[in-house]
UniProtKB/Swiss-Prot annotation, chains A, B, C, D, E, F:
The lineage of its organism: Bacteria, Bacillati, Bacillota, Clostridia, Eubacteriales. The record marks 29, 253 as: Transition state stabilizer. GO terms for molecular function: acetylglutamate kinase activity; ATP binding. Keywords: Amino-acid biosynthesis, Arginine biosynthesis, ATP-binding, Cytoplasm, Kinase, Nucleotide-binding, Transferase. SUPFAM superfamilies: Carbamate kinase-like. This is Acetylglutamate kinase. It comes from the Bacteria. Its EC number is 2.7.2.8. It is an enzyme of class 2 (transferase). The gene is argB.
Length: 295, 295, 295, 295, 295, 295
C-alpha cells in the first residue's frame, strides 16, 4: 500500500505546478539526444501531451538532428566554407527545409497524434510565422578586418507573427515548429533552433522557455555533475563567462536565455534531454532539474 | 535519479485518465473516517482540487459525521423512536440542518479555499437544488401489517434541479453539497447522503459516482482483505446478496450504485476512505481501488 | 375604472427608476423587525424578487436576528465580558456560524425560491468572499490606557472577493449572504452585518446600499416622525453628530454609509424595515423613503 | 402611509406577469382613438416602454388614423369605387405609403425615443419584412356571379420575414411597423393593419396579440358595458356570430384573433384603446381588460 | 479566350481593394442624376450590394431628388422666402419628411432587397440617429447687419447616435438613411444630405465618404473634362477657392469633405454619379474616378 | 470610358456567384502545368486569395509535380516494379513526403502569404487529417489470377478528420494540403492527390470540387477543342466511357467526381489549368469553363 501512497504523493506534489502554469505558454526547444533515442523521444512526447492535458500550452520548436547531414551526404552535397564558416547554398537550404519541415517536423506531429495528443506541424512560412532576412557574419578578411560576409541562406529573425500559434494552441493543438524563416520574396532561411525558440517565446509572452540539451545544465566543474548550478541570475552571467564556467556551446544557449528574459519571458531553463522525462520533472516537481536562468 | 524517473512514470501513468475524464463530472459522497481524521480530510481535499485542476468536475456531497449527534447531545435533544425507527422531529431537523449546512459544509469549503481551490457550499434549498417530500417508512403495526408511518422530517428526493451546480462547476468552482432537501412550503428534509449523491449523479449525467466508505470495498470473505471483489456487474448483485457477501450497511450502498447506473451514470465505486488519497488512486492509477460496480 | 388608472399610474411612475437601475447592483442589509415578522419578511422577499425581475441585481446581506441568542441560551452558553465588552469565544462562534449560515441564510433562500425567485445562500467562506482577521478593540486597562484587547472571534474585513457574487447575479440568482468572515487558516469570524454589506457594496461597485432598520430614518427630533431628514450629505454628518441628532446605534449606521460612499457606492439609504415594502417604495417611487445619505 | 402600501401592492401584483412574459414577444396593433388623442397616445407609448424595460419584447404595428384621408383630401385625390368597393390606385397608394411609413410611423418612433425608449420604424420593405401580392376581392358582376376583381394596390400577405424584427428586439429596440407590403417587383401594397399584426405575431411565435380598438371588447348586449365577455374560446365564436353578438367590424377582428391562435400565438386580446394605459392593465394586472380570445 | 483573361484580370485587379476595405465602412451620399435615371439607379444599387458582399459596410445617405418639389407642387405649397432664403415651414417640412422617409427611402430599400441585398430604411428619428436643432442663417437685415434668422425647420446636427447603424451593418444589412433630424421635442428638421453623410461618416469612423454628384469632379477648367484634378489635399483647398476652381455648389461639397477628414474619415471622394457604376470603379479599380480629397 | 463600364460589368457579373458561394467550401486539386509555369502558378494563387477575400473557403490539395522525380533521380533511387506496377519502397516514400510536405507545400504557402493571403501548410499527419492504410493492388500472378499485391507505401483513405481544416478556414487561413496519409503506427502513405481532394471535399461537405488538369475538359472528339462537353450528369458517365469519350487518365478523374457527388459534394469540375485564372473564371463568371459533372 506504501506504493499507492507514494503515487498519490507525487500526483499531489504536481498540484501547485499545474495551478501555477494553467493557461500559460511553455516554449520547448527540442533537440539533441532526445531526438535520436526512441525511448527518450517517446518520453518527451508524453511529457508534452501531459502538459497540454493539464491546461498548459506547450509549443515545440525542434532542430534537425543528424537527419539533415544524412540527406546531404546521400545527395553528395559537400559543404563549402568561407574562412572556416560553413556556407548554406541554395541546394543545401533546399535539403535543410525538406528534411526539417517535411520529415522531422511531421514525424513529431505523427508521434503526438499517435499517443493521443493533437498536433499541427508548422514552419516559419505558415501564417508568416517566422519572417527572416539574410544574416551576414563578421568574418576576418585578408587584411584582418572583420567584414560582414554572405554565408548563404542563414537567417536572422526579423519578426514573429504569433497569431497562428496562439489560435492553434487555444483550440487544443500542440504547435510543432521547424525553424525555417521566410524572406520578403518567399525565400527560405535556416534559423538557429535555440534562437527561433527564444524569439517565439518572447512573441508569445511565454512563461517558460526550456532548452533540451545534452548536458546536465551549467556545471561549476565540468567533470563533476554534483557541481550543477541549479539557478542563476542574468547578473551572474558575465562573471561565469569570465571564469570559464559558461563556455563553448553553452555561451549561445545562455545568451538565448538572457535575451528571452529581457524580452519578457518568465523563466528559462537549460535541462538534460538525455534524462527521460526531464521536461516533466522540471515542470511538475519540487526540485526542478538542470539550470534555471532568471532575471 | 531513479526516484525522479519513478515520479515521471507515475505522472505519465495518470495521462490516459486525465484525458478520459477531462470535462467529465465525478460525484463524490464524502463521509465516514475521511471526515474525522485531519490527515485523511486534507488528503481528500487535495484529491478533489487536483481533479478540478486537470479539467475534471468533482462535485462533493457530504454526510454529517459525528457532529450532528454531538450537537443534539449538547442541546439535550433525545431521539424518539417508533417501532425502533428514529423519528426526526422539528427540533432535531433544525439542528441537523444547522450542523450540516452551517458548519460541516462551510468547513469543507474553507478547507478547499485554503489549499488553493475555489468552492461554494450549497444545500438543497439553494437554487431549488434538492426538492423533497416527506418519506413514509413501512412499519409493522400491532396487527403485524406494514403501514406507512410518519418518521418526521426525513425526505425522499422528488426532483433535482442541477442548473446551479453545473453553472458553478463550469466557472471553476467545486460545489460542496449538504444533503438537505426542501419541500413545497420551504420546509427542510434530511436526505440520506448516499441517496442524494446518487440522485445528483444521475441529474448531472455524471461519469462516475464514488462512495467513500470505511471498508475496503466488497469482500468475498469479510475477514480477508485480500478477497476484495474489484469489479462486479449489476447482474451479479442478487446472487451476492443471496450469499451474504453483500449484507448489512453495504446493501443500501450497492443499491445506490445500481440505481445510479440505471439512471445513466457511467461507473460507480465503493472505496476505502480510510486509505489516504484513495480517491486520487481510484481516478488516476491503473489499478483502481475498492469495488467498481458497472452496468 | 379610476382604480385601474391609478394602478397604471403607479406602474408608469416606476418606469424611470427601472430604467435608471437596470443592470445596476443594489446591496441590501436585511435585519431587525423585517426578519421577525412573517408579513414583513414576505414583503421584503417580494420586493427583492421584483427588483431582480426588472433587471436590477439585488444582493442581500442579513443579520442573525434573535435566533442566535435563542440557540446560545438553549446550549447554556453564557457570554463572557472584558471590561463590558462581550467576548465571542470559540463555542459561541460555532453557534453564530451555524445559525447564520445554516439556518437564517437558508430560510431566506428557501423563501425566495418558494415565491418564484432564484437564490443562492453564501457565507464569507464560499469562494473566499469575505476574508477577515481578528479585531482588537481598544479597551481601557487598569492604568486607564486604551490597549488593543482580544475579544475573540470578531473580525474586521481584510478583503472582499466579489467574483462569485457577480457571477451568480449575472446568471439570474439573488445572492444571500451571511456575514461570516474567514481567516487565513480557515477560521471563522463574526462580522458586523452593516459593515459586511457596506464593504460588499464597495467591492461590487454597487449603485445603492440600503440598510433596513427599525427606525423611520434620521429624525431631527427623535419623538417626532414628521421631523425626518430625507436627505443629507457626508459634509452634514459631523454637525448632526455634534447636535446629537445622529447618536447611539445610528452612529455606526451613518458611518457605514459614509464609508461606502467614499468607497464609490452611488447612494446609501437608511430606511424603515417595519413598513411593509419600504424597499420597493424606496427604489421605485418618486418620494423615496427614510434618509438618503449622499456624497 | 396607506397610499404607499397600495403603491407597493400594485407593483407586487405585477410581479407574476413580469415573470410570465419575460423574454416573450407581444404584438400590439395600435390604432383608433389611441392614435388621435395626445394623452392616450402618450399612455400607449409609456406602456410599451415599460413592457420593454421589464424584459418583454413589444412589437407595434400601427394603422394610419385619419391622416391618410387628410392628405388624400389635400391632394384632391378622390376615391374610385367598383361595386361599392374602394379602389386603391397608384396615386392613392403612393400617399398611403408616404403617410404611413414617412409620417405616422416616424412620429411614433420619435415619441418612444423622447420618453426614453429605443425604437426603429420599419415598413414591410425593410429586410423584406412583409412580402405581399395583389388581393382580388370577390365582387358580384352583372350576372350576379362573384368574380375576383382587381381593387388596386391592396395586398394579401404572402410571407413574413421576421429576422430583422427579432434582431432589433433582441438588441433593445422596439420595432414599430407600418403595414405596407412589398411585391415581387418592389411595388407597394396596402395591408390591413390587424391582418399584418396577426401574421407578424404568428411569424414571431408571439405569446400575445393585443388589438387596441375603440370598443370595450365584445359585449353580449352592445348597449350595456357591464355585459362584457371577458374571455371566450375559438369554439364559442361561431355561435356568437350566429347570435349577432359578434358582428360588423368586430367580425374581422375576431377572425384575426382566431387565425393568430391557430397559427400558434398564445393569447389574443381585443381591448379598449380609449381607456388610458389599457395595454398596461391588460398585461400587468390580475383582472385583465377587454375580451381575451383563447384556443 | 482573350475576353476571359481580361475578365479574370479585372477581378484580380479588385483584390487589393477588397482586402483593403474588408470590414471597413464607406458612407455614400446618394443623390442627383443617379437617383432619377433608372439604369443609373440600378447600377448604384448593384455597386452597393457588391460592396456588402465582399465584406465592406456601405451606408447610404440619400437626398430627395425632384420628388419633394413634385409633391409640394401637387399640394399647392408655395415656398416663402426671407431675403432670398427659402423658409421650410411646418407644412413643407411635413411633406419633405413624408417624401424622404416614406417614399424615396423605402424605394431604395425595396430595390436593394429585390436585387438580393438586405436593407433597412432609417431616418434620423430611428434610434435617435440624427439629433438636430434649428439652424439660424445669418441674414442681412435692413441695416445691413447679418443677424441670425429663423428659416423654419432646417436643422444643424447636434449629435449622431451611430449604434443602430453599426448594429444593422454588422448583421448584414445595408442601412439606407433619409437625412431627417429630430429635435428635443421630437420635431423634425430637414438636414442637408451631404452634411448628414459627412457627420455620419465621422461618427462611424468611416474609411471613405463618397459624394455622388452630377459633375466629373473638380475640374481645373470647367469646360475641359480632361482637366480633372484627381487628387488634392486639404491644404490645397483655400488656393483653389481663391482661384475660382472650387466655386458655386462645389464649395459646400468640398467643405463637407474637409470637415469629414478633420473628423477622422480616411478618404473623401467627389465622383460623377452620371457615369454608371462610378461607385464600383472608384472603390475597386486602380484608376479611381472623380476627385479624391485627402488630409 | 467604355473600358471602365466593362470593368464594372464584369465585377457586377460576379455578384451572384459571390452571393451563392459566400461561406461555402471549395476544394481545389492543384496540379499539372499550373504548378510548373510561374505565371500560371501566380494566377492560381491570386484566384484562391480572391475567393477567400469575398467570403468563400478555398481548400487547396496539391500534387507533387516533377519535383519528386527530380529528387529521386538526384538520390539515385530507382523504381522497382511488380508486374508493371511501380512499388513505393520506404526510401522512396521518405523522399515523396519530404518533397511534398517540406518543399512543394511550403512553397505554395509562402506564395499565398507573399501575395497577401494567410495560409497554413498541412499534410495528412497534422491533426490526424488523412488516416490511411496500405493499398493492395490486384495484380495478375503467374497463374493469371488477380491477387492483392503489396506495392509499398501507397495508401487508401480510411478516415478524414476535417476539424483542423475547418478551424483554420474559419479563422481566415487558406489550408494547403499535401496528400500524405498517416497509418496506425504513424507511418506515411502516398495518397493520390485527386482521391485525397475528393475525400476531403466529402468530409468537409464542400459545395464544389475543382480538379485543375492539363486538358480542356472532356472533349467529345479529342482533337477538337470545340467539342467540349460543358456539363454532364453521373448517369451519362457509363455510356461516355463505353464510347471511349472518357478514357485513359480521364477515367479516374471522372470516377473521383462521381464518388464526391455521391458523397454529398454539390458540383464537381474538371477544368483546364493551362488557361490562366481558369479557377476564377469557373467560379465567378456566367459561362463557367471546362466540364462540370453533376448529380
Amino acid at each position: 500500500m506504501l506504493k499507492a501512497l507514494e503515487k498519490a504523493g507525487i500526483l499531489v506534489e504536481a498540484l501547485p505546478y499545474i495551478k501555477k502554469f494553467s493557461g500559460k505558454t511553455v516554449v520547448i526547444k527540442y533537440g539533441g539526444a532526445a531526438m535520436v533515442n526512441d525511448q527518450l523521444k517517446e518520453a518527451v512526447i508524453m511529457d508534452v501531451i501531459l502538459m497540454k492535458l493539464v491546461g498548459i500550452h506547450p509549443v515545440v520548436v525542434h532542430g534537425g538532428g543528424p537527419e539533415i547531414n544524412g540527406m546531404l551526404d546521400r545527395l553528395g552535397l559537400k559543404s563549402h566554407f568561407i574562412q572556416g564558416l560553413r556556407v548554406t547554398d541554395e541546394s543545401t537550404m533546399e535539403v535543410v527545409e525538406m528534411v526539417l519541415a517535411g520529415k522531422v517536423n511531421k514525424e513529431i506531429v505523427a508521434l503526438i497524434q499517435r499517443f493521443g495528443g493533437k498536433a499541427v506541424g508548422l514552419c516559419g512560412k505558415d501564417g508568416g510565422l517566422i519572417q527572416a532576412k539574410k544574416r551576414f557574419e563578421l568574418v576576418k578578411n585578408e587584411g584582418g578586418a572583420r567584414v560582414p560576409t554572405d554565408i548563404g541562406f542563414v537567417g536572422d529573425v526579423v519578426k514573429i507573427e504569433p497569431g497562428l500559434v496562439r489560435e492553434l494552441a487555444d483550440r487544443g493543438y500542440i504547435p510543432v515548429i521547424a525553424p525555417i524563416g521566410v524572406g520578403e520574396k518567399g525565400e527560405s532561411y535556416n534559423i538557429n533552433a535555440d534562437t527561433a525558440a527564444g524569439e517565439l517565446a518572447q512573441a508569445l509572452k511565454a512563461d517558460k522557455l526550456v532548452l533540451l540539451t545534452d548536458v546536465e545544465g551549467i556545471l561549476r566543474d565540468r567533470k563533476d555533475p554534483s557541481s550543477l548550478i541549479s539557478s542563476l541570475r542574468i547578473d551572474d552571467v558575465p562573471a561565469l563567462v569570465e571564469e570559464g564556467v559558461i563556455s563553448g556551446g553553452m555561451i549561445p544557449k545562455v545568451a538565448c536565455c538572457v535575451e528571452a528574459l529581457q524580452g519578457g519571458v518568465g523563466q528559462t531553463h537549460i535541462i538534460d534531454g538525455r534524462l527521460p522525462h526531464s521536461l516533466l520533472l522540471e515542470v511538475f516537481t519540487d526540485k526542478g532539474i538542470g539550470t534555471m536562468v532568471l532575471k
